[in-house]
A protein has these predicted regions:
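Helix-rich "cap/lid" substructures immediately adjacent to catalytic or cofactor-binding pockets
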Residues: 2-87, 151
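Alpha/beta catalytic cores of group-transfer enzymes, especially the acyltransferase/condensing modules
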Residues: 10-13, 39, 100-164
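Basic, gly/Ser/Thr/Pro-rich low-complexity segments located predominantly at protein N termini
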Residues: 14-16, 21, 45, 93, ...
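A broad detector of short, well-ordered amphipathic alpha-helices
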Residues: 33-34, 67-71, 93, 106, ...
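Short, glycine/charge-rich beta-strand/loop segments that flank catalytic centers
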Residues: 53, 87-91, 128-132
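Short amphipathic alpha-helical segments at helix-loop
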Residues: 53-57, 96, 100, 125
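Gly/Ala-rich beta-loop-alpha elbow adjacent to hydrolase catalytic centers
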Residues: 69, 84, 88, 92, ...
Length: 164
């Protein structure tokens, strides 16, 4: 049997994430310390203490998710789990590249932080948003967006990641 690890994109972050693993596994603490060093600020403190209003900013979310993902991968590796293949959804592709040995962890932290900054500049806070719509057919999502467009303003159905 083959084993695959798939790393998540942004959106799964929350204040307090991985604090238990940080306290239990030295490799998790090491990864967070390396991320802090690469960023020049404490993503560790932001992940564990917040505030959420700062953690959700994409320039912070992206290195936080990458750090958490790679730290979890390292714990699994220490426990004897080795994937035959790795992949990632959106931002998770960077975690997969680190797990595959293609990209250095600290370089990846820096790159996704810059990626997040540029994304935030492109769409400043309060100027737009994305929402995950679950369990609706594509056609219904498009129809609802069109109804909103007719009454409120510009809403587009994009990034269809899976059926329903």
């Amino acid at each position: 049997m083959k084993t695959a690890f798939v790393f998540p994109g942004q959106g799964s972050q929350k204040v307090g994430m991985l604090q238990d693993l940080y306290n239990a596994y030295p490799i998790v603490k090491q990864r967070f310390e390396e991320a802090d060093e690469a960023l020049g600020y404490s993503i560790t403190k932001l992940c564990f203490e917040g505030p959420d209003t700062e953690l959700v900013k994409t320039a912070n979310t992206q290195p936080a998710i990458l750090t958490a993902s790679v730290a979890c991968y390292e714990v699994l590796k220490e426990q004897g789990f080795t994937p035959d293949i790795v992949g990632g959804h959106s931002l998770g592709e960077y975690s997969a590249l680190v797990a595959a040995g293609v990209l250095d962890f600290k370089d990846a932290v820096y790159v996704v932080h810059k990626r997040g900054e540029y994304m935030q500049e492109a769409v400043p806070l309060g100027k737009g948003a994305m929402a995950a719509i679950l369990a609706l057919p594509r056609e219904q999502v498009v129809e609802i967006c069109q109804q909103v467009n007719d009454t409120v303003g510009s809403v587009q159905a994009v990034n269809f990641n899976c059926p329903g």
